[in-house]
Amino acid sequence: MAVLAPLLAVLYAAPGLLRWVSQPYYLISALLSASFLLVRKVPPACSVLPTQREDGNPCDFDWREVEILMFLSAIVMMKNRRSITVEQHIGNIFMFSKVANTILFFRLDLRMGLLYITLCIVFLMTCKPPLYLGPEHIKYFSDKTLEEEMQSDGRVSWIVEFFANWSSECQSFAPIYAELSLKYNCAGLKFGKVDIGRYPEVSCRYSISPSPLSKQLPTLILFQGGREVFRRPQVDKKGRAVSWSFTQENVIREFNLNELYLKAKKIRKHQEESIHENEWNDGKKDQ
């Protein structure tokens, strides 16, 4: 049973793992993250490396390298406690593995450390995380169409995400937001997105800082009657976002999506009944 459970977990996650491996970003990032392990463990590359082991074996970790790797594992576990999606878990592993690799390579040789940093910089400049391309029921706005749509029908409630493609938090939240749009979208409750990286004037209009240090991306705002009534995350006096986890459960609870959805459905039903009643009255008059 102890062997069966992990095996079933791997089989269940196999489609997602294959999807990641098929993406150049994840494949190259995995190779960079495991590069020190490969160099230290795989002959003949490891045979020419310096070592501080008492037995002089260059193809095994010395005590300092083991300490660094154990510290890396502890940091990853701490960071992953707040991760929401599998992509965030994998991203944390990749990021901190590269940091640890940089330290380990510099311990071996200055030239190897510089080469590794160069490869990481080239990777960051040429490879971007794949954007979410799954099903969704979301309308994308520009700086002009956003205001027009918010004012067009006061009976419709809008939840709008302000995002930037370069933000890893926005990328992680994309599948969650798409799933919410598929579940709750109706005639009286709609979902939208606007890219403040492309339309910076929108960020000024709604007081959303695009700076990574502000941690305001993504920002969700609920509009009713053309006015903002609620947003997450909130911003303190210093302009920094108050910590808030963009989980599906938090969005549903904080934005009262279940209640908004039921109200929107009732309004729609009432409108349809009124239309049918008017059509029936018009038909009687014609007779």
UniProtKB/Swiss-Prot annotation:
The chain crosses the membrane at residues 113-133. Residues 14-112 are extracellular. Its main location: endoplasmic reticulum. Residues 137-209 form the Thioredoxin domain. CDD domains: TMX2. Keywords: Disulfide bond, Endoplasmic reticulum, Membrane, Mitochondrion, Signal, Transmembrane, Transmembrane helix. It is a single-pass type I membrane protein. GO terms for molecular function: disulfide oxidoreductase activity. Residues 1-13 form the signal peptide. It is found in: Endoplasmic reticulum membrane; Mitochondrion membrane. Residues 134-287 are cytoplasmic. One of its GO terms (biological process) is brain development. InterPro entries: Thioredoxin-like_sf, Thioredoxin_domain, TMX2, TMX2_thioredoxin_dom. It comes from the Eukaryota. A motif (Di-lysine motif) lies at residues 284-287. The thioredoxin domain lacks the 2 redox-active cysteines, suggesting that it lacks thioredoxin activity. The di-lysine motif confers endoplasmic reticulum localization for type I membrane proteins. Endoplasmic reticulum and mitochondria-associated protein that probably functions as a regulator of cellular redox state and thereby regulates protein post-translational modification, protein folding and mitochondrial activity. This is Thioredoxin-related transmembrane protein 2. It comes from Xenopus laevis (African clawed frog). The gene is tmx2.
